[in-house]
Amino acid sequence: MDWDAKMPSWDLGTVVGPSGGGGGGGGGGGALDLKLGAPTSWKTTTTVSAASAAPAAVAPPPPPPASSSSSAAAAGKRARAGQGQQAAVPACSVEGCAADLSKCVRDYHRRHKVCEAHSKTAVVTVAGQQQRFCQQCSRFHLLGEFDEEKRSCRKRLDGHNKRRRKPQPDPLNPGNLFANHHGAARFTSYPQIFSTAASMSPQETKWPANVVKTEAADVFQEPYYHALHLNGAGAAAAASIFHHGGNKARKHHFPFLTADHGGGAAAASPLFGCQPFTITPSSESRSSSSSRHSNGKMFAHDGGLDNCALSLLSDNPTPTAQITIPQPLFAGGGQYGGGGGGDVSLTGLSYVRMAGKDTSILAKSATTTATTATTPTTTSAQLQYHGYYHHHVSADQGSSDAAIQALPFSSW
């Protein structure tokens, strides 16, 4: 069948319906506006609704001025500070004390919360207990913990004394002076004592004329022998050296020079520096033996020196005999005894003045200690020493041999 290619004409008026006034195009547009709305109407409606809702919103208050806010903050701070000061007003801790410590001149009482009167009161009541204020630690303490004399607590006082007081040195004890020296009894050399005498000139070391009498100017011109260290075997060797020789060939051993106090000689041992002492021979053995003392050391030689073995005892018929000492051990501090068989004592040096003659004398010098002893002899003589031991000298007027007795001396 044949199709009609022409499109039928549509009548809009019949489809939509008649509209009063205007053409068909205008009527069709009005019908669409009622159902869908035009774009212009949408914009107008939105603008009108926004304008009507704006007055309904609540507007925020305007910001206050800066000056008013700072003044309010300062006022709040002042109020809080005033409350704190009222709560921290210092008051005395003692019960019943209404003292206002804010008026005290010293800040000490405000810091420790005690008035000046109660800080020195013997007994106060704090927290229901009897206490006392300690001025050392600035606290209240019970009466049992307090020292009434010192006005301080005992615990604080003990610590204060320990910090302030220096330790006192132990009293001088001769046993502790030579703690480094052990073993058998010995003599010890002290160069710090004798160095002064060794360096002194002959003019400075002259003894008074009434104390020392020099019989020969060249009595100390010969070479000196070394000193003996009296310790162990050295003591036995010393016993064999120090004896009285002569034509009679008699030997007097010194028991204080031997370790076992025996009479026999022992094997020889080296010679060392020793504590100074002097042995003076008798008048009988002048030509065979002599001993010397110089600068705090002992020197001895035995036999064969007849031309130099000068007597150290005076042959003067006066009632005193004196020992010649070339140099003193110390520059001063001497004590000199009177005449007539008295004693002569010097600091660090001891020797004898004896009545009569032809008497064996033993003199010794030693380091000064705190004690001094004097021993009378049969010839009304005295041996005064400053040291650790002494020797008793006894002799008969008719005999030239003198027995020498040794007393025990301290060993360290």
Swiss-Prot record:
Give binding positions for Zn(2+) 1: 92, 97, 115, 118
Ranges of Low complexity compositional bias?
48-57, 67-81
What does the entry state regarding organ or tissue expression? Expressed in stems, leaf sheaths, and young panicles.
The molecular function terms of the Gene Ontology recorded here are:
DNA binding; zinc ion binding
Q: Which InterPro entries match?
A: SBP-like, SBP_dom, SBP_sf
Its domain description in UniProt is: The SBP-type zinc finger is required for the binding to DNA.
Record protein name field: Squamosa promoter-binding-like protein 2
Species of origin reads: Oryza sativa subsp. japonica (Rice)
Gene name tied to this protein:
SPL2
